[in-house]
Amino acid sequence: MPTYAPKAGDTTRSWYVIDATDVVLGRLAVAAANLLRGKHKPTFAPNVDGGDFVIVINADKVAISGDKLQHKMVYRHSGYPGGLHKRTIGELMQRHPDRVVEKAILGMLPKNRLSRQIQRKLRVYAGPEHPHSAQQPVPYELKQVAQ
């Protein structure tokens, strides 16, 4: 019997909603990245995008352990001399908490031809509401140790 090789149209995609309230950022990112890639499915293949859609709500209430809010820096460069911009995670969490969560999740995805396609299935919202109720997302529970 030949080995089963999934094709792009063979997979059925579901929608999951993850509540980020009091969840450690790294553990949230790992769970979301696995859902986006489809590693929880028996038909997983690394060369086919078979993952599901993921909605992350309450990104402003995510837990960042240790003193990373004050000391972990995020860098960007404009491309011009002297164009290095740096901010702490705490400053970014005040302005754009959804971008901090999104950057953590996207950093755990592979950097290959499928990455853009996988990234389009991620939606992150700072508050508790999201506009995807028509897709009937299933709540995804993260198992974590109490903090």
From Swiss-Prot:
Disulfide cysteine pairs (residue numbers): none
Protein's recorded name: Large ribosomal subunit protein uL13
The keyword Ribonucleoprotein is annotated on this UniProt entry: yes
Pfam families assigned: Ribosomal_L13
GO cellular component entries: cytosolic large ribosomal subunit
GO molecular function: mRNA binding; structural constituent of ribosome
One Gene Ontology term from the biological process aspect of the record: translation
HAMAP family: Ribosomal_uL13 (MF_01366)
Classification via CDD domains: Ribosomal_L13
Region span, Disordered: 128-147
Keyword Nucleotide-binding: no
Superkingdom in the source lineage: Bacteria
Subunit and interaction comment: Part of the 50S ribosomal subunit.
Gene (name only): rplM
Function in brief: This protein is one of the early assembly proteins of the 50S ribosomal subunit, although it is not seen to bind rRNA by itself. It is important during the early stages of 50S assembly.
Keyword list, A-Z: Ribonucleoprotein, Ribosomal protein
Family indicated by similarity: Belongs to the universal ribosomal protein uL13 family.
